[in-house]
């Protein structure tokens, strides 16, 4: 027995030593020896998702002569989170997402909902411009009119009524309708009310101008257009293995062809890491001190999905419920109309899953590989401080098929198991961040990372993500290229996004013009709720210069 304990103690000590060695291993990429006369490209985009595609499109319009490179590890673009089946396809506008509004001291706070709504207005303007330029094809190939409905029952009815009363004071939510009449809700969303208990107290709000968006389609169309530019080059099946700074302050991005095994590198003045969940891990390769404050926590999602015409014909809406008290934002249930590649589906979820992968097509070693001496303590601290999230994930992972069906029946009482299949969605990585003088926190939104000189940027986090990609990338341009966005790029940016630098929540006239223009261009449903509606519905509003 003593001999066994001795060996066990030695084994434990060896494991501890190995763990310490692992945590203190070098993370940053080694500097690559490059020739002085080696050509330098203007921008490298890591990842072939909607963020890189959107940023690349901005670049080619602002600087047509720039040399741009895009690297994607899969054999096609838009196969991770941007793929139509890997996300819920919501054009997030704050119309129905009740987690964007909260009641504090008896007052309903709607600022976050206004922020998200304003950002999606930027997205619609960007896509409208691309349609006008012939970059994006027929709008119905990527966006379709689908009303957004917030639906509650029981004690949440009072919350929704207060939310509605607060929201209609903002121009962004004018035209929202509220009802407690089951017959009206049945007209709006028949599936939700079919065979529902008639004694149950229910309420709903509805915004007609809502939409369903296929972000995978947008990504592919943008990249297809980029490929027509001789200054742009896409390499698929190519994994970025290193990002290191050169003595002249340029950067070298090293990569490997996953089909041939060949390695190579490119020198660049600017790097954008738009690799979804893998962004945290890739950012660590830079060795930038600012990158050490980040870690990632991976969470997956599953959806129940049906393409049964008898069901899809009864539902043309995105219906969001309210998360249970204490549940994380990712737990908000919704039953959605989806249009993917010309076919109509109804989707319900999400149901959280857990995996150590940072990407759907990633490795189970991703979480471990991202752990190092700089972030192991903050990861541990955040884990201990978010036991409710851990408990929620465990409860979700333990759900049976019957449990998931019962959740669906809260929103579609007549649901039958044989009509639905379980579909694995994309992988998201929530940010764990430690700022100087502040405790480490787990964050549920998106965040732009920019080095001090703006030469290295990344997008970290998850929702709302894709739906506000044009706004997010515009914000990134401002952080990385402040002189250009204020100077020579300014006029073009106002041409692309008419409301650029304007606060639509405080300018109902401009908001109305913008919504009439984008709705006409994109085929969305919009009836002006303002008395002084602009008569020139389809005409693009005039941009205001800075």
Curated annotation (Swiss-Prot):
A GO biological process held by the record: tricarboxylic acid cycle
The protein's enzyme class: oxidoreductase
InterPro entries hit by this protein: FAD/NAD-bd_sf, MQO
Alphabetical list of Pfam families matching this protein: Mqo (PF06039)
EC numbers on record: 1.1.5.4
Cofactor(s) listed in the protein's UniProt record: FAD
Domain of life per record: Bacteria
Catalysed reaction, written as an equation: (S)-malate + a quinone = a quinol + oxaloacetate
Alphabetized SUPFAM superfamilies for the sequence: FAD/NAD(P)-binding domain (SSF51905)
Pathway: Carbohydrate metabolism; tricarboxylic acid cycle; oxaloacetate from (S)-malate (quinone route): step 1/1
GO molecular function, one term: 2-hydroxyglutarate dehydrogenase activity
Record's keyword terms, sorted: FAD, Flavoprotein, Oxidoreductase, Tricarboxylic acid cycle
Keyword presence, Flavoprotein: yes
Recorded family membership: Belongs to the MQO family.
PANTHER family assigned to the protein according to its UniProt record, in alphabetical order: L-2-HYDROXYGLUTARATE DEHYDROGENASE, MITOCHONDRIAL
Protein name: Probable malate:quinone oxidoreductase
């Amino acid at each position: 027995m003593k001999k066994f304990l001795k060996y066990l103690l030695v084994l434990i000590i060896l494991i501890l030593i190995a763990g310490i060695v692992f945590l203190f291993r070098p993370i940053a990429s080694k500097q690559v020896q490059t020739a002085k006369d080696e050509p330098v490209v203007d921008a490298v985009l890591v990842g072939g998702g909607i963020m890189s595609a959107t940023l690349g499109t901005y670049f080619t319009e602002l600087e047509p002569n720039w040399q741009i490179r895009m690297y994607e590890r899969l054999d096609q673009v838009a196969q991770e989170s941007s793929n139509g089946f890997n996300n819920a396809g919501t054009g997030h506008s704050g119309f129905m997402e009740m987690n964007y509004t909260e009641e504090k001291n008896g007052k309903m706070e709607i600022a976050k909902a206004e922020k998200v709504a304003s950002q999606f207005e930027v997205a619609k303007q960007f896509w409208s411009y691309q349609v006008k330029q012939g970059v994006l094809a027929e709008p119905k190939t990527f966006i379709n009119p689908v009303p957004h409905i917030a639906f509650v029952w029981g004690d949440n009815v009072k919350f929704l009524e207060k939310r509605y009363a607060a929201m209609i004071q903002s121009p962004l939510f004018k035209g929202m309708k509220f009802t407690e009449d089951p017959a009206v809700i049945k007209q709006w969303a028949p599936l939700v009310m079919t065979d529902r208990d008639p004694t149950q107290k229910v309420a709903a709000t509805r915004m007609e101008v809502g939409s369903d968006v296929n972000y995978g389609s947008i990504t592919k169309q943008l990249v297809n257009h980029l490929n027509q530019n001789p200054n742009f080059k896409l390499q698929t099946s190519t994994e970025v293995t290193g990002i290191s700074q050169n003595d002249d302050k340029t950067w070298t991005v090293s990569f490997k062809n996953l089909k041939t095994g060949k390695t190579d590198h490119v020198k660049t003045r600017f790097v954008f890491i738009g690799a979804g969940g893998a962004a945290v891990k890739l950012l660590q390769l830079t060795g930038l001190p600012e990158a050490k404050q980040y870690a990632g926590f991976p969470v997956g999602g599953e959806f129940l999905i049906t393409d049964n015409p008898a069901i899809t014909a009864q539902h043309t809406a995105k219906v969001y419920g309210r998360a249970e008290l204490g549940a994380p934002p990712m737990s908000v249930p919704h039953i959605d109309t989806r249009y993917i590649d010309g076919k109509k589906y109804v989707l319900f979820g999400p149901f959280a899953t857990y995996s150590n992968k940072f990407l759907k097509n990633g490795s189970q070693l991703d979480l471990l590989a991202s752990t190092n001496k700089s972030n192991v303590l903050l990861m541990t601290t955040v884990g201990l401080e978010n036991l409710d999230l851990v408990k929620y994930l465990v409860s979700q992972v333990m759900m049976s098929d019957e449990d998931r069906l019962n959740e669906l029946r809260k929103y579609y009482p007549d649901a039958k198991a044989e009509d639905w299949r379980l579909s694995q969605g994309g992988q998201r990585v929530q940010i764990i961040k430690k700022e100087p003088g502040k405790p480490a926190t787990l964050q549920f939104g998106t965040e732009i990372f920019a080095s001090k000189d703006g030469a290295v940027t990344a997008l970290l986090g998850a929702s709302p993500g894709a739906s506000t990609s044009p706004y997010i990338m515009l914000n990134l341009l401002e952080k990385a290229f402040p002189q250009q966005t204020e100077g020579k790029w300014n006029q073009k940016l106002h041409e692309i996004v008419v409301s650029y630098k304007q606060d639509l929540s405080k300018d109902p006239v401009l908001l109305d013009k913008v919504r009439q223009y984008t709705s006409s261009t994109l085929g969305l449903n919009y009836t002006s709720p303002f008395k002084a509606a602009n008569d020139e519905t389809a005409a693009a509003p005039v941009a205001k210069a800075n």
